[in-house]
């Protein structure tokens, strides 16, 4: 076992703390390579979903349950042609207080083969007070590749009164179609002398983005777009007075904001991809949103993402 581990370490890129390869083995998607070193740990359970789905599952875990100041986690994932793989976590990724202004960093580079499916469905990132976090994710795809990306973060330990107290958060997502840019997105939150992050975010505690790309996911895209449009048309509808059009009854100057706000936008040629953006007051409301809208992935993955505990 030690000799095998040494060979894996030598084969992995020098800067990588993790490397995964998924290939077809006897008609099923299987993890044929799984290398990780501190501070990353990768677990590939043999039974994570229905066997009939033929999908491979992978759990990314950090020692101690979080990322400390100065840690750099770099992982590569290769999903072979016709394979299906899901990468998730067991709990939210905690980012601890920065020391000497050092960022905690995560970098993921994934290659999704032809007619393959890769679902990156982690729990949210939770930055503690004074934390600094930077994340970059790059996905290489083909015209018939299928990709699900959930990228989300919370305000911190808000139930304990720690709300938007981190110093810096940046997340970058790139999708390259045959090495040409297809989707580029960046989210940046940084404390300012004029307005704090808390001032700007008001009562909202969660920000999320969901990317759906590929022919196998078109029905999920369409359903999500339709349901989000209906949900927001109801939530953002101006209040009407019971007295009718000419009523003098006063309306509230500051109507209550909806507990969850979402929007959907297509991208790519012929709308082959879709991005949904969500902000919400509570983490559980986003879990419910993801659980509902991604339930249709079960036939591909053998299990529903974000199952109710």
Curated annotation (Swiss-Prot):
Q: Its biological function? A: Required for the maturation and activation of urease via the functional incorporation of the urease nickel metallocenter.
The entry sums up its family as follows:
Belongs to the UreD family.
Which residues are in coiled coils?
none
- Which organism is this protein's natural source? Oryza sativa subsp. japonica (Rice)
Say if the entry is tagged with keyword Chaperone.
yes
Q: How does it assemble?
A: URED, UREF and UREG may form a complex that acts as a GTP-hydrolysis-dependent molecular chaperone, activating the urease apoprotein.
**Alphabetized UniProt keyword annotations:** Chaperone, Nickel insertion
Among PANTHER family, the record links this protein to: UREASE ACCESSORY PROTEIN D
Q: Name one GO molecular function term.
A: nickel cation binding
Q: Which InterPro entries match?
A: UreD (IPR002669)
The name under which this protein is listed is Urease accessory protein D
Alphabetized Pfam families for the sequence: UreD (PF01774)
